[in-house]
């Protein structure tokens, strides 16, 4: 398992500075937001520097973007243009290990043409959807990809934790309890998480990890909230997870935390995770 970080939550440095900084702190992988990767793809100097850093530091690169915001021609056209730029960059540098996508509510009824477009255009990388396929209707949209070894899941454990508690509903698809994963419970157990992971019908390429209160998507550091991080580490060992684990704590989003405290807290969170995983 590679241990990585979503670096877009630390904006006091540039993207390239964050790649270098967090690689030096011992992270095996870095994840760049798609909206930050796009302008890099359009700049040859930054593109070359990013590829150099990835190779020189010996780390894995993942990129996290969104499928179209809605089905409008404008959104779809913008999405395809960005994917085309990712594809051109990937053909040249071959450095994106996983390209993953959020799926927003307005398009969850039909995402097949969008994910098919990505798989057709972007070479040499795994393609993942975050938390999609929680219902039979959603799974039917990706059924045709079961034989495609490049396609799989990004599972957000923070979101899964909230779904298991079963206290969020009404239009928040990512947070609605999924009985296929686990019945709603006051305090999810290791067996609940094992059942959830084993219920997935596609390979899990990447995991996002952050804590919360079991109700709200707070993206806390790992020493805050009620998620049992050691239990999660034990579960991932039990299923022999060999993908990428990306810490997605988000200082300054749902809770106050700014530089330099944010750097101190995320490095502490990384130490906590390494202790839990036994690294």
For every predicted segment, state its role.
Residues 2-7, 30-32, 61-66, 97-101, ...:
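Hydrophobic faces of well-ordered beta-strands that scaffold small-molecule active sites
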Residues 251-279:
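Aromatic-rich peripheral "rim/lid" segments of glycoside hydrolase catalytic domains that contact
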Residues 1-84, 151-154, 179-183, 188, ...:
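N-terminal pre-domain/capping segments
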Residues 22, 48-50, 80-81, 145-147, ...:
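Short, hinge-like loop/turn segments at secondary-structure boundaries
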Residues 30, 116-226:
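Acidic/histidine-rich catalytic cores of soluble enzymes
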Residues 53-61, 65, 69-155, 161-162, ...:
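Active-site acidic/histidine proton-transfer and metal-coordination neighborhood
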Residues 7-16, 33-46, 68-78, 105-111, ...:
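Acidic-and-aromatic substrate-binding clefts and catalytic sites of carbohydrate-active enzymes
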Residues 19-23, 43-57, 85-88, 137-146, ...:
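Short amphipathic alpha-helices and their capping/turn segments at secondary-structure boundaries
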């Amino acid at each position: 398992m590679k241990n990585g970080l979503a670096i877009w939550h630390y904006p006091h440095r540039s993207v390239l500075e964050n790649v270098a900084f967090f690689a030096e702190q011992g992270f095996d992988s870095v994840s760049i937001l798609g909206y930050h990767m796009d302008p890099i793809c359009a700049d040859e100097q930054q593109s070359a520097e990013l590829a150099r850093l990835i190779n020189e530091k010996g780390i894995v690169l993942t990129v996290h973007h969104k499928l179209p915001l809605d089905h409008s021609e404008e959104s779809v056209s913008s999405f395809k243009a960005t994917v085309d730029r990712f594809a051109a960059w990937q053909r040249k540098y071959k450095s994106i290990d996983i390209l993953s996508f959020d799926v927003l509510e307005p398009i969850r009824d039909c995402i097949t043409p969008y994910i098919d477009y990505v798989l057709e255009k972007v070479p040499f990388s795994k393609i993942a959807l975050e938390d999609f396929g929680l219902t039979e209707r959603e799974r039917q949209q990706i059924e045709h990809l079961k034989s495609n070894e490049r396609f799989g899941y990004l599972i957000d454990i923070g979101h899964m934790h909230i779904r298991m508690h079963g206290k969020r509903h009404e239009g928040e698809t990512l947070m609605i309890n999924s009985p296929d994963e686990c019945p709603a419970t006051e305090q999810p157990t290791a067996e609940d998480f094992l059942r959830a992971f084993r219920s997935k019908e596609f390979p899990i390429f990447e995991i996002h990890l952050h804590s919360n209160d079991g109700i709200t998507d707070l993206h806390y550091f790992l020493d805050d909230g009620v998620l049992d991080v050691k239990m999660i580490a034990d579960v991932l060992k039990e299923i022999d997870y060999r993908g990428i684990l990306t810490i997605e704590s988000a200082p300054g989003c749902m809770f106050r935390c700014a530089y330099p405290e944010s750097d101190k807290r995320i490095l502490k969170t990384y130490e906590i995770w390494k202790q839990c995983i036994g690294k």
